[in-house]
Regions:
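N-terminal catalytic or cofactor-binding beta/alpha core of small enzyme domains
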Residues: 1-133, 139-151, 155-161
């Protein structure tokens, strides 16, 4: 498993993927929102690197061209993915180590989106997959996922400071 200090290098784009109307599936967009608030609260302090934060919702393919034009060194895609773990547990997987899980609630297969970015940017691509508890329509993010959201936000923010 990778650590954030291993992967958050150079020009960074963090992409939150997920549907905020489906409980824990909204983890990716919720993390982006939390990170944006963290950076706004700190203001003009010096960071090692300020990432570009993109809430891609449930249509990451709509942002593929925009991401490619930014020519990042590192792309971290954050999504709720059924990894067979306990709810709230997560893994960071390098693109080259990724095995197609077959799980996505999005219009374009996550692996196709990632393949496009890999070809167009040459960036190191990582997937931060969080095990959801509940992805039912109309549900809120579960407590276990909220706790993970807080933890990951602190880890990312701390690494970039």
């Amino acid at each position: 498993m990778f650590l954030f200090d291993d992967i958050l290098k150079g020009k960074i784009i963090i992409v939150g993927v997920g549907n905020t109307l489906r409980g824990d599936d909204g983890f990716g967009p919720a993390l982006i929102e939390k990170l944006k608030k963290n950076f706004e609260e700190i203001g003009d302090r010096q960071y090692k690197s300020i990432p570009i934060l993109i809430d891609a919702g449930n249509a990451p393919e709509n942002y593929a061209g925009k991401i490619a034009k930014k020519k990042p060194d590192t792309i971290l895609i954050v999504d709720a993915i059924d990894l067979g773990l306990k709810p709230g547990e997560y893994e960071i997987i390098k693109r080259t180590d990724m095995v197609e899980t077959g799980f996505t609630t999005h219009n374009m297969s996550l692996s196709m989106f990632i393949e496009f970015l890999e070809k167009e940017t040459g960036a190191e691509i990582y997937i931060l997959g969080v095990q959801p508890k509940n992805v039912n329509l109309g549900e809120e993010i579960s407590v276990s996922i909220q706790n993970t959201l807080d933890e990951i936000s602190r880890l990312i923010f701390g690494q970039l400071f």
